[in-house]
Structures are given as C-alpha cells and as structure tokens.
C-alpha cells in the first residue's frame, strides 16, 4: 500500500507513530516503526505483536478519555487517524486535541485515512481550522478500491526570526538563546 511507502520515505526507521484505530496495517507499520495503537475493539487488540496497544473502549462515540491520559506527555513523529469505526465519530478527536494539543503539536505530520469520504469531511475541515495544512493526498486507485488518505502538517513560525518548523518544540528552541 502506498501509505506505507510514503511513511517509509518520509520518516526515519524506528520513528514513533501513534495510530487511532488499528488493524492488519499495524503489522506492516511495526516492520519499520515503533507503533502505539489505540483500539476500542477487543478483537483487534494485539493483532500486531510488536505494537504497544492502549485499550480504549468507546464512550459517547469516542475513545475513553481516561485510557488516553497516558499519551499526554508522549511525543510521536507521526499520527495516523483511522478510527474509531464509524468515520463520522472522528470529529470527537477535535475536542481531545483542544485539551491535549501537545500530542499533535509535537508530531511532524498527521495522516488521515479516508480523508475524502463524506463522513470524514467535517472532521477534516475542523482539523484544518486548527492550523493543519494539506501536504499530500493519495486518491487511491482501482487496485486498492479507491482507498484514499491525506497527510497534514502544521507550521509553527518563530516569532523572533520567522523561520518555520513542523514541530512546536523545534520552533521554541529556535531563538531561545538570544
């Protein structure tokens, strides 16, 4: 699948990835990356033996916030949004990002699976309002039945010199020594 190729081309081997929603693709991800998988379906738990799973049952159509608290001080190179089941429910991630912005602000980029689907549209629009910009879109093809995904980046500009960074912490360190 081209998403794996894109990630391999754009992330150093061994990079930490957080994925909302896991599946058979998690097995492929763990071949190159250190993966943490948030999963609400017990049947998918531990499918990829090399992934670290966080079991987070759904509460009000979104992963249990208490189960996700463990993530608040974690840093990931990339985040993949492919859950929970029922793509319209992804809109609840916006509330979580607003409470724990660091998890996303430290990420180099965010991959949103099925970004072009009508069910996901509201989430993608709200996500862009948080300052995330489209970097890459793969519309899918006949071979993968139109499976589409998009990559978003957030630019953090140094207020001192104007240099742009993908990660908030890198921007903070830019002119800190002035």
What role is predicted for each listed range?
Residues 2-60:
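SAM cofactor-binding core of SAM-dependent methyltransferases
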Residues 162, 175:
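Cys/His-coordinated zinc-binding microdomains
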Residues 167-168:
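Short, non-ligating residues that shape and space the ligands of small metal-coordination modules
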Residues 158, 171:
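Short cysteine-rich clusters marking metal-coordination/redox-active sites
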Residues 15, 77, 108:
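Conserved acidic residues
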Residues 63-74:
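Short amphipathic alpha-helix with an adjacent loop that forms part of the alpha/beta core around
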Residues 74-82:
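Short SAM/SAH-binding signature in class I
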Residues 85-155:
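C-terminal substrate-binding/active-site "lid" region of AdoMet-derived donor-dependent transferases
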